């Protein structure tokens, strides 16, 4: 059988909210009770054909800060539920675990489904921004789905959302707005903060410059930067140092 996973930051949330939905779907499909079983000790569903659906607890562990425990798994496909709760490293390691269990045997492409409300974690940069700009890679897909699109939701639930939610939360959860915290009075635009780590918008400049914060014998470091236009390409620092040492370093740059 094939191997699938359903991942969430807290396993308890999967038990409380996702397992009842799985039972509902199995019943809608008309599968008899003996066609599957749930192993509550190891947290997986096993189907009549041997395929398994593992429920994964993806909370942060100080002993595994980069979530490497997921990278060694062998999965056919997977699903990240509430992707807005996930860090990039957990998403990345879950992603590399798919396509490794009987995909070739059953001619199945490795696929990862992520469901989430609008958030400003890796989803914003990896999916929403490229989708909006028309640059999303062909092997990825972004599907914007609003509560109004779900025909299974009771009308009273939608009405309750409309009455209860306010401000940014209403824009985010009801109308699917990803730029929900863009404030025109904010000191820095959120997209500009993200761009700090890439600076793709800065034109290439052939002129180079040097800046130096000379600390000498103070408690601060002496910091020297080499710039190509507005791009900082080198950083050098010195502990307590004489002017001759600083001059010597500058002459080598």
Regions found by a protein language model. Name each.
Residues 150-212, 226:
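ATPase catalytic-site recognition across NTP-hydrolyzing enzymes
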Residues 13, 85, 217:
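Residues immediately C-terminal
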Residues 2-14:
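Conserved RecA-like ASCE P-loop NTPase motor core of nucleic-acid helicases/translocases
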Residues 15-76:
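Inter-Walker segment of RecA-like/P-loop motor cores
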Residues 81-82:
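Walker B catalytic acidic pair
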Residues 225-253:
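Nucleic-acid-processing active sites and adjacent nucleic-acid-binding tracks
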Residues 85-156, 160, 164:
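ASCE P-loop NTPase helicase motor core
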Residues 205, 216-223:
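Short, flexible loop/turn motifs enriched in small residues
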């Amino acid at each position: 059988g094939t191997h699938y996973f359903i991942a969430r930051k807290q396993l308890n949330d999967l038990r409380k909210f996702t397992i009842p939905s799985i039972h509902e779907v199995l019943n809608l499909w008309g599968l008899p009770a003996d066609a599957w079983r749930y192993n509550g000790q190891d947290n997986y569903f096993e189907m009549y054909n041997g395929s398994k659906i593992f429920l994964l607890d993806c909370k942060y562990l100080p002993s595994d800060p980069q979530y490497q425990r997921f990278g060694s798994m062998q999965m056919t496909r997977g699903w990240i539920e509430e992707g807005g709760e996930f860090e990039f490293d957990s998403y990345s390691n879950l992603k590399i675990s798919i396509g490794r269990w009987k995909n070739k045997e059953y001619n199945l492409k490795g696929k990862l489904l992520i469901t989430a409300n609008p958030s400003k974690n890796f989803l914003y940069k990896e999916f929403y921004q490229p989708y909006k700009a028309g640059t999303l890679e062909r092997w990825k897909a972004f599907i914007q789905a609003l509560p109004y699109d779900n025909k299974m939701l009771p009308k009273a639930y939608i009405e309750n959302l409309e009455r209860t939610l306010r401000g940014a939360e209403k824009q985010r959860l009801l109308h699917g707005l990803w730029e929900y915290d863009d404030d025109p009075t904010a000191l820095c635009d959120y997209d500009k903060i993200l761009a700090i780590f890439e600076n793709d918008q800065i034109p290439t400049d052939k002129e180079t410059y040097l800046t130096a914060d000379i600390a000498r014998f103070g408690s601060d470091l002496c910091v020297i930067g080499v710039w190509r236009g507005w791009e900082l390409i080198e950083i050098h620092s010195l502990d307590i140092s004489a002017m001759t040492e600083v001059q010597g370093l500058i002459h080598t740059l």
